[in-house]
Design a protein with these regions (language model features):
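Cofactor-centric catalytic regions
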Residues: 3-15, 19-38, 51-197
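Phosphate-handling active-site elements
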Residues: 39-43
Length: 206
């Protein structure tokens, strides 16, 4: 089970608190990618906090390739909650009903009209509640979500190693090494390729 906390700061920057600690796998990059793609905020305005037990939420660590498969949905749930609250704020600001509001590319817009408001303006309204539905919504934009998968995931893959063995000395030399893995949805191809090459290079270690 993983917990993700997402905080939209008054400046419009985003802070993600995660209990899954990166050991070089690129969690910070991929989690920031998810926030960027879902909210449309600038990539360099997203800060991912991990490894600080005084600040981060509950998490079981990065084991069994679970950080994205399990932590990713928890992060997306928190973002969806923020978008949902943002739609309520936008509906108030645009004098529309909640059902009329859609969110895309960093903007809340009213269906079948040219009325819209930027995500940054909704954030500002959330923290300066002068024109805000204070009776029904608490100020601020910060959400937390848990995700516990209903079952385990098992990736499929095959590794084939061709070796030569010196019959006199017993010396083993790797001639060729082929890897085939099913990764599912790849968020960042460069990171996946790097992890794959690193694990393959480990075969040459002594």
């Amino acid at each position: 089970m993983y917990k993700r906390q997402v905080r939209i700061n008054p400046t419009g920057s985003v802070t993600v608190f995660t209990g899954s600690h990166s050991h070089g796998q690129g969690h910070e990059t991929v989690f920031a990618q998810i926030v960027h793609e879902k909210l449309g905020v600038a990539f360099d305005s997203i800060d991912v906090v991990h490894g600080d037990t005084g600040r981060v939420p509950f998490g079981v660590g990065t084991v069994g390739s679970r950080s994205l498969a399990v932590g990713g949905p928890a992060l997306m749930r928190s973002i969806d909650k923020i978008i949902d609250k943002g739609k309520k704020i936008a509906a108030h600001l645009l004098d529309a009903s909640y059902d009329e509001i859609t969110f895309k590319d960093g903007e809340f817009s009213v269906s079948n009209s040219n009325k819209f408001i930027a995500f940054s303006d909704v954030v500002g309204a959330a923290y300066v509640p002068g024109n805000y539905p204070i009776e029904t919504l608490e100020p601020g934009l910060e959400e937390t979500s848990f995700y516990d998968p209903p079952n385990l995931t098992y990736p499929a893959g095959a590794h084939i190693c061709e070796i030569e063995i010196d019959p006199e000395t017993g010396q083993i030399d790797i001639v060729n090494y082929c890897v085939s893995d099913d990764f599912g949805i790849v968020m960042n191809p460069m990171i996946v390729e790097g992890c794959l090459l690193y694990t393959s290079d480990a075969a040459d270690e002594e």
